[in-house]
Amino acid sequence: MKFTQMLTAIDTHTAGEAARLIIGGIPKFPGKTMAEKRQYLETHKDGLRKSLMLEPRGHQDMFGAFICEPANEEADYGIIFMDSSGYLNMCGHNTIAAMTVAVECGWVDVPQGESQVKVVQDTPAGLIHGTVHLNPSGDVEFVSFENVPSFLYKKDISIFVPSLEKEVVCDISFGGNFFALVSAEQVDLDICPKNSEVLCKIGMEIRDGLNQNVRVQHPILQHIAGVDEVEFYGPAKSKEADFQNFVAFGDSQVDRSPCGTGTSAKIAFMHAKNLLNVGDSVICESVLETKFKGEIVKECKVGDYAAIIPRISGTASIVGFNTFLIDPKDPLKQGFLLK
């Protein structure tokens, strides 16, 4: 039996959300920036993503990333985020997973006796600086990273939702990707696992309606445009959290984690509404009630927009080491989705 490809991966999850990190067997991605590398991958090598994210190796809600050479020499590694429907410019839960693996698997040096390790990754949205916190045994306890500048982009936008037969009001906020923020109260649904399917359906309708009717363009990064994700938010279920969210994205995918970029977008929104100040922090819980911490590090500007630098903290776990083979005779070698 001959194979055209043998790909190695480290499977992880962050607060319940899958993060499959592809670390071997991939070709070199040309490009002077990570955005160019992502574009090359999308245009010329998208079969790799499909093979790794779709069935039978993955599933509709699969998420992962290619680990590659960084475009910026300051970074320890480059990372290109992907899911079952395509690519994202930034991902918080995958960042936490990659930085955990970088330390646990020896990608970065850990000086003996140190309780913190600095890690820098290069993404299509820019450089991400993180700190991996270690316990006394030297194992990773949690990861914090400073996200890209995040800001409220448009507020109080009404959009008609066909399945609800009414309009809802949302705010568009950037946290590495563009999010439509919608209070769950408007759709009369509690954020909980049993409502995931209907919340996701409504979320896709909101996202598609916004992208058809509202121009969304990052003021500096021209390759970032359009609403990628919809984040419903509501009261927290647990006493440790400040609010709960539910994030729908991709091809009707549901984030199991509190979503690092979504938490960034939410606290940027809260800062713009004078609900949070520099130095304040919140705990966001997911549909599974797993938690991320979001903090406002400082204020900044993105073009003409008032913005913040968020810090997101969370934990990830390694769940397996995989070797994937691609057989050229396999009629389903690039995967499929059955819904």
Predicted regions located by residue number:
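A glycine-rich beta-to-alpha transition motif near the start of alpha/beta enzyme domains, typified by
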Residues: 1-173, 180-339
